[in-house]
């Protein structure tokens, strides 16, 4: 049974990808008002931003119970982040592991900036809950995706703004198979299909071929993770019920 907490509105970090789309659905099931926030930081896979409106429209029209809950969308130009980043997410370079053990797809400070800006918007909009798709289970070791980072950031933002916001990360302890299953629990096969076809994950921005698991090059780390998770989800591997 999905829990519903309609007392507060939520602002969801929504890139146009699988994880953040699942988080939008998760928030729509819980809150009366859900707004979305995207960032254009010069990402190599900017096509994800072009998917956002299609996902939002599909959520409105295919899921009547959520239609009135989905509120405004916000898009922030954060090109300064791309300008100061020398990564495979913002440059056309090979994806590889760096000397510090992190992949060069790591954009230093990205989630910290995202959440800080989100908090400022939520403060102005009267929204108490911030929702992000950060995950510490199936991830690339990004330090700004860790649970400890999010908890520390929640404390810092509340101190700095003298407020009581909550940072929700519903995917934090889920693997990709469980993320697919969570989508099924939230919106059935219709939501799984929406996410499969309408969202974008591929780091290199490839959207020419629709695979069983969605669009993508099939070779970058993001595609491999999405593919592996989808196949495990179909087989029912590693998961009995995704925690809600």
From Swiss-Prot:
Its cofactor is Zn(2+). Zn(2+) binds at residues 202, 217, 220, 223. One of its GO terms (molecular function) is ATP binding. HAMAP family: QueC. It comes from the Bacteria. InterPro entries: QueC (IPR018317), Rossmann-like_a/b/a_fold (IPR014729). SUPFAM superfamilies: Adenine nucleotide alpha hydrolases-like. Keywords: ATP-binding, Ligase, Metal-binding, Nucleotide-binding, Queuosine biosynthesis, Zinc. This is 7-cyano-7-deazaguanine synthase. Its EC number is 6.3.4.20. ATP binds at residues 14-24. The keyword Magnesium does not apply. Pfam families: QueC. Pathway: Purine metabolism; 7-cyano-7-deazaguanine biosynthesis. Gene3D superfamilies: HUPs. Belongs to the QueC family. The gene is queC. Binds 1 zinc ion per subunit. Catalyzes the ATP-dependent conversion of 7-carboxy-7-deazaguanine (CDG) to 7-cyano-7-deazaguanine (preQ(0)). One of its GO terms (biological process) is queuosine biosynthetic process. It catalyses: 7-carboxy-7-deazaguanine + NH4(+) + ATP = 7-cyano-7-deazaguanine + ADP + phosphate + H2O + H(+).
